[in-house]
Amino acid sequence: MSAEASTTPAAETPVNGTPETSTTPAAPAAEATAAETAAPSTSQPHSASLYVGELDPSVTEAMLYELFSSIGQVASIRVCRDAVTRRSLGYAYVNYNNTADGERALEDLNYTLIKGKPCRIMWSQRDPALRKTGQGNVFIKNLDAAIDNKALHDTFAAFGNILSCKVAQDEFGNSKGYGFVHYETAEAANNAIKHVNGMLLNDKKVFVGHHISKKDRQSKFEEMKANFTNVYIKNLDQEISEEEFRQMFEKFGEITSATLSRDQEGKSRGFGFVNYSTHDSAQAAVDEMNDKEVKGQKLYVGRAQKKHEREEELRKQYEAARLEKASKYQGVNLYVKNLTDDIDDEKLREMFAPYGTITSAKVMRDTNIERTQTPDSDKEKKEESKEEKPEAAEKTEEAAKESGDDQDKENKKSDKKVLGKSKGFGFVCFSSPDEASKAVTEMNQRMINGKPLYVALAQRKDVRRSQLEASIQARNTIRQQQAAAAAGMPQPYMQPAVFYGPGQQGFIPGGQRGGLPFAPQPGMMMGVPGGRPGQYPGPFPGQQGGRGMGPNQQIPPNFAQGIPMGAMGPGGIPNGMGYPQMGQVQFGRGAGGRGQVPGMPMGQGMRGPGYGQGRGGVPVQGQMRPGQGGRGQNAQPAAGRGEEAPAAGLTAQSLAAAPAPQQKQMLGEALYPKIQAQQPELAGKITGMLLEMDNTELLSLLEDDEALRAKVDEALSVYDEYMKNKGTEGEAAGEAPKPKEAATEESTEENKS
């Protein structure tokens, strides 16, 4: 039998890559449950498949093979792993070629240490019905912490053949104080219960009984809740005695036990328990004594609960309160960020007060850890220094002390309320959703102290996380589609993304190898192999004889995708790619010519078939003039491309009105001239880097030259660091870093050759 066909115990069967949730605390014991009628086939299975549990996550098939092959020939080994993360689930299957080897492995290797953890071996039971019957399954509690799986197995092995034995452990490997032993027959289980129940194991009296499934325990528990007899009382006066406590509750019925909880010194802890013989008496005590004042304190009297019950009730109460709070503040609580450090709670409230009634306004701050020195410590230091000085300086010291006291008073006043540093964001809660909506409309992107505010409805952390994950997934999908569209273009390696400004030649550092330091964005052109713009390898040989384009200036397929409108010259050709600016030029099919350039998409500059003479091409030199002869050229008036003009006076309204893919293009066209004035050589690169930012932040940079200059400097430092790291890698590889100009020339020569 192959390991793929073998199944796991019920508690550890993977469902969609995750272990099945156990139905009982005894689930680990029910792993190998088998009906009494199946005993012969269980002890002598037709297959030789073993289940190996309690494995360390780092255990591999090779480690298990080394251990189990010492017994006999192993047919196959499989460590079960999560379907998604591929992490080990902590158990495996070992298949032998014959049953005898499996029996020897079960006898000799059970509880053997593997990576410091004792493994647990049992026959693999493929029938889940037999695993979940529960016959022969014994539950043991009140175990000493020193008792492990092997010690428990050795203790109970005298009463019959054990199929599975396990001590429950927490996440740190410590015993939880209970365990399970699953016998082959019900008679063996009854025999173990008869002889071990109530015995001392490691000086602790243990309870041994038949395992009850969680479903049965739950139904029994609900019945016990409805017929409770044990009553819990708290808020008791500490002076009350045991006798007074008993007399207080005796009038409701016969009491089997009553006790007050006391500390180590014998003082009352203010609560106790009373157990009645009947449920009616307990219910009467709860109804009569709950919320009753005794010695000036209002009592709480209710059904005694176990710890897990109380925790579950508290969890439900917390969840209900959280949902109620979320629904209460839905649509009225605003999140405000980009606040300056001088804005406190009062100023934040004043900023939003004109838009409605504010119920709360809070600026989030860091926890103030550092405290100024207290006046007491100052006085102590002064007294110490006073003792060290000679008596002749006492008068001077007294004067200094008086002035120091005055300073201490001033410091005390200033230290009354020390606020931490502002985190730059806060929350404002209005009384109605309409007021909150009005505040968002009026205050979002408003300049406050030179910074544009970001105002939006507050969201819970899990909602923000889900939205962010959806956004990232959508972005990755778009990138995959773009990559698939450009799959026909050979790309031995890619340069960093570059933004081409209107009429400018984009700058790409030459001679680089490796991946993109920054992810491409809409409005940026992917870097090209080689060193200079316009150089493409592969099936685009240099054209000779003045036919259209000069050497190393070929147009690759899909090259126009991702180029911003402002960077597109006439005819859909990016400016600065080695082509001169000209009137509207169309690539068309000339009479007897070869037509459109292969793979060239019909861009904005190619609005229809033009018919010229000869092959479609673009002149290498000179400015195109109306009527100028050219092979395969038809001049068009430039008035038809007004939509391609660079955006001027870009506003949030005009940006929001544009389609999402064009927004980055518009921002890039507006940013490029400003950046070019500061960094002419790296303007295209820095623009591409800044386009990674949020649109609202880019709009604020357009309005604030100082902030833009700071961002440009920051981007320049990041770029310099990147180039420095690339140079360091080249030196480590035995190559000296080359200057930009030399690297560019070298890559040009490579492309020519």
UniProtKB/Swiss-Prot annotation:
<keyword id="KW-0539">Nucleus</keyword>
<protein>
    <recommendedName>
        <fullName>Polyadenylate-binding protein, cytoplasmic and nuclear</fullName>
    </recommendedName>
</protein>
<dbReference type="InterPro" id="IPR006515">
    <property type="entry name" value="PABP_1234"/>
</dbReference>
<comment type="function">
    <text>Binds the poly(A) tail of mRNA. Appears to be an important mediator of the multiple roles of the poly(A) tail in mRNA biogenesis, stability and translation. In the nucleus, involved in both mRNA cleavage and polyadenylation. Is also required for efficient mRNA export to the cytoplasm. Acts in concert with a poly(A)-specific nuclease (PAN) to affect poly(A) tail shortening, which may occur concomitantly with either nucleocytoplasmic mRNA transport or translational initiation.</text>
</comment>
<dbReference type="Pfam" id="PF00076">
    <property type="entry name" value="RRM_1"/>
</dbReference>
<dbReference type="GO" id="GO:0006417">
    <property type="term" value="P:regulation of translation"/>
</dbReference>
<dbReference type="Pfam" id="PF00658">
    <property type="entry name" value="MLLE"/>
</dbReference>
<keyword id="KW-0813">Transport</keyword>
<dbReference type="InterPro" id="IPR002004">
    <property type="entry name" value="PABP_HYD_C"/>
</dbReference>
<feature type="region of interest" description="Disordered">
    <location>
        <begin position="607"/>
        <end position="649"/>
    </location>
</feature>
<feature type="region of interest" description="Disordered">
    <location>
        <begin position="727"/>
        <end position="753"/>
    </location>
</feature>
<feature type="compositionally biased region" description="Basic and acidic residues">
    <location>
        <begin position="376"/>
        <end position="417"/>
    </location>
</feature>
<dbReference type="InterPro" id="IPR035979">
    <property type="entry name" value="RBD_domain_sf"/>
</dbReference>
<keyword id="KW-0694">RNA-binding</keyword>
<dbReference type="InterPro" id="IPR000504">
    <property type="entry name" value="RRM_dom"/>
</dbReference>
<dbReference type="GO" id="GO:0006397">
    <property type="term" value="P:mRNA processing"/>
</dbReference>
<feature type="compositionally biased region" description="Low complexity">
    <location>
        <begin position="1"/>
        <end position="43"/>
    </location>
</feature>
<dbReference type="InterPro" id="IPR034364">
    <property type="entry name" value="PABP_RRM1"/>
</dbReference>
<dbReference type="GO" id="GO:0003723">
    <property type="term" value="F:RNA binding"/>
</dbReference>
<feature type="domain" description="RRM 2">
    <location>
        <begin position="136"/>
        <end position="213"/>
    </location>
</feature>
<dbReference type="InterPro" id="IPR036053">
    <property type="entry name" value="PABP-dom"/>
</dbReference>
<keyword id="KW-0963">Cytoplasm</keyword>
<feature type="compositionally biased region" description="Gly residues">
    <location>
        <begin position="607"/>
        <end position="619"/>
    </location>
</feature>
<dbReference type="GO" id="GO:0005737">
    <property type="term" value="C:cytoplasm"/>
</dbReference>
<feature type="region of interest" description="Disordered">
    <location>
        <begin position="363"/>
        <end position="417"/>
    </location>
</feature>
<feature type="domain" description="RRM 4">
    <location>
        <begin position="332"/>
        <end position="460"/>
    </location>
</feature>
<dbReference type="InterPro" id="IPR003954">
    <property type="entry name" value="RRM_dom_euk"/>
</dbReference>
<dbReference type="InterPro" id="IPR012677">
    <property type="entry name" value="Nucleotide-bd_a/b_plait_sf"/>
</dbReference>
<keyword id="KW-0509">mRNA transport</keyword>
<comment type="similarity">
    <text>Belongs to the polyadenylate-binding protein type-1 family.</text>
</comment>
<feature type="region of interest" description="Disordered">
    <location>
        <begin position="1"/>
        <end position="49"/>
    </location>
</feature>
<feature type="compositionally biased region" description="Low complexity">
    <location>
        <begin position="633"/>
        <end position="649"/>
    </location>
</feature>
<keyword id="KW-0677">Repeat</keyword>
<feature type="domain" description="PABC">
    <location>
        <begin position="647"/>
        <end position="724"/>
    </location>
</feature>
<dbReference type="GO" id="GO:0051028">
    <property type="term" value="P:mRNA transport"/>
</dbReference>
<dbReference type="InterPro" id="IPR045305">
    <property type="entry name" value="RRM2_I_PABPs"/>
</dbReference>
<feature type="domain" description="RRM 1">
    <location>
        <begin position="48"/>
        <end position="126"/>
    </location>
</feature>
<feature type="domain" description="RRM 3">
    <location>
        <begin position="229"/>
        <end position="306"/>
    </location>
</feature>
<keyword id="KW-0810">Translation regulation</keyword>
<feature type="compositionally biased region" description="Basic and acidic residues">
    <location>
        <begin position="737"/>
        <end position="753"/>
    </location>
</feature>
<dbReference type="GO" id="GO:0005634">
    <property type="term" value="C:nucleus"/>
</dbReference>
<keyword id="KW-0507">mRNA processing</keyword>
